[in-house]
Amino acid sequence: VVAGSSSVKVFTAQGMKTASVLRTDEANDLAVLKLAGGAYPALPVAPSRRIRLGQTVATIGFPNVQIQGFSPKVTKGEISSLNGIGDDPRAWQISVPVQPGNSGGALFDEYGNVVGVVVSKLGIRAARATGDIPQNVNYAIKSTYALALLEPYLDASAPEPNQEATQPRFEDMV
């Protein structure tokens, strides 16, 4: 989405903002963006090794704003596979419903930790190839790969991952 761009428009709960493209990783379909207009709190990131098959996950995004409007939408699902398409070990397969506008958004565990980044879904091309319409077959790059891209921008103030026993569940924070 950002290939070749030095800046992009980003939808936020406060409206549309401009973001600079700091770094990209085409192999994992990731980019590091810096929003203009202030400082924003960092989100806690959980290591990929903590994720389990069947674990509840969610994303927040601005899908299909022309139809669904500009308010953020939360969708929940599960980790359907510990590997992505074609058993790609860099990604999770998720049952979280995603639409255009969710791509690039954080995938959260039930404690509000970022565990991945939503990158793709099976859609019409898969339906043409298989004769069946995929339902909630979506993918997120694991947090380990996102952290590698973010490493130059992290500092000591980055929050530690929330612990299961001491932190509220994701649905209590939304």
What are these regions (language model features)?
Residues P97-V118:
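Catalytic nucleophile loop of clan PA
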Residues T18, P41, F62-F70, V114-V174:
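C-terminal cap/linker of serine protease catalytic domains
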